[in-house]
């Protein structure tokens, strides 16, 4: 009997259970959307010196289509014909057991889409309003070449799926509770399409505690700069001699006496600090879609 143990990473495990209590939903789009919570696994019990490859699939659950009605999900008719679940091999390829067990194994590059014609290798096609469950499979590999991916079923070391990672694929969130949870727990979730939340994350104004009146960086006019003081013309026939200068007067350059060609004084900068709204360089997830 295999001693291999697979579990969900602690913080993600907690999130999956929170979402599962309300029947989790995942947005599918033509361009693909990443899963949240993340699929991040911990694997124990592998042979440290043997080679393994790890594969993820999103398998259909049941044979029904679902709809959200009366504040809850319910089955409504037969499911559409499902294609074979796409095999997503982990990007790390074939590695020793010691390497796989060194840290968590995350499938954060996977995206789900409702566009069946996509050729994107990281995209998985799902039918909207159908339920799916992630399934992790660990294969023993005869070669360390990342292109030698094992396929035969007799090389399977372990398979793991967790009921609380089930979700229904949707094109827009149906349950307001799920919408609220996504906003609360996903730092990149950007709110509603009605514009209540800004699409860009901004830091507050430096000049006061409120940024409600702060203009955007694109609309801010540049600060006015005081013109430089004009310098009197230099007489090329006047040359200074050091012994003629007062000890308290600075030596001027290039050709005039200090009192004939004073240097312009440097304008002092304003002590007041400009109010700035700064765009953070941060990857932003698409808007949260909701019904209606």
Curated annotation (Swiss-Prot):
Protein name per Swiss-Prot or TrEMBL: T-box transcription factor tbx-9
Pfam families: T-box (PF00907)
The organism's taxonomic lineage, starting at the top: Eukaryota, Metazoa, Ecdysozoa, Nematoda, Chromadorea
Superkingdom of this protein's organism: Eukaryota
Gene inactivation effect: RNAi-mediated knockdown causes about 5% embryonic lethality with 1-10% of hatching larvae displaying posterior morphological defects. Defective intercalation of dorsal hypodermis. Simultaneous RNAi-mediated knockdown of tbx-8 causes at least 48% of embryos to fail to hatch and those that do display severe morphological defects and die as larvae. Simultaneous RNAi-mediated knockdown of tbx-8 abolishes muscle expression of vab-7. RNAi-mediated knockdown at the larval L1 stage causes a decrease in expression of lin-39 at the larval L3 stage.
Keyword Transcription regulation applies: yes
Keywords, in A-Z order: Developmental protein, DNA-binding, Nucleus, Transcription, Transcription regulation
Cellular component GO terms, alphabetical: chromatin; nucleus; transcription regulator complex
């Amino acid at each position: 009997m295999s001693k291999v143990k697979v579990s969900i990473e602690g913080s993600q495990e907690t999130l999956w259970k929170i979402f599962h209590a309300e029947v989790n939903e995942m947005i599918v789009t033509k361009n693909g959307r990443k899963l949240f919570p993340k699929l991040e696994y911990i694997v124990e019990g592998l042979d440290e010196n043997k080679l393994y490859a790890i594969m993820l699939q999103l398998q259909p659950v049941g044979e029904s289509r679902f709809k959200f009605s009366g504040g809850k999900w319910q089955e409504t008719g037969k499911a559409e014909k499902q294609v074979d679940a796409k095999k997503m091999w982990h990007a790390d390829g074939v590695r020793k057991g010691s390497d796989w067990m060194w840290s968590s194994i995350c499938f954060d590059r996977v995206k789900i889409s409702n566009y069946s014609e996509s050729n994107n290798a990281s995209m998985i096609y799902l039918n909207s309003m159908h339920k799916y469950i992630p399934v992790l499979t660990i294969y023993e590999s005869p070669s360390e070449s990342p292109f030698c991916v094992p396929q035969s079923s007799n090389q399977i070391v372990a398979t793991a799926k967790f009921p609380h990672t089930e979700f229904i694929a949707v094109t827009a969130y149906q349950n307001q509770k799920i919408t609220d949870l996504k906003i609360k727990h996903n730092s990149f979730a950007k709110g509603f399409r009605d514009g209540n939340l800004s699409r860009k994350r901004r830091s507050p104004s430096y000049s006061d505690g409120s940024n409600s009146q702060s203009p955007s960086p694109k609309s801010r006019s540049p600060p006015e700069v005081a013109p430089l003081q004009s310098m009197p013309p230099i007489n090329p026939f006047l040359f200074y001699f050091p012994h003629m200068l007062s000890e308290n007067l600075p030596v001027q350059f290039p050709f005039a006496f200090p009192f004939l060609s004073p240097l312009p004084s440097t304008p002092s900068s304003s002590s007041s600090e400009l109010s700035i709204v700064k765009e953070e360089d941060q990857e932003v997830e698409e808007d949260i879609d909701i019904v209606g």
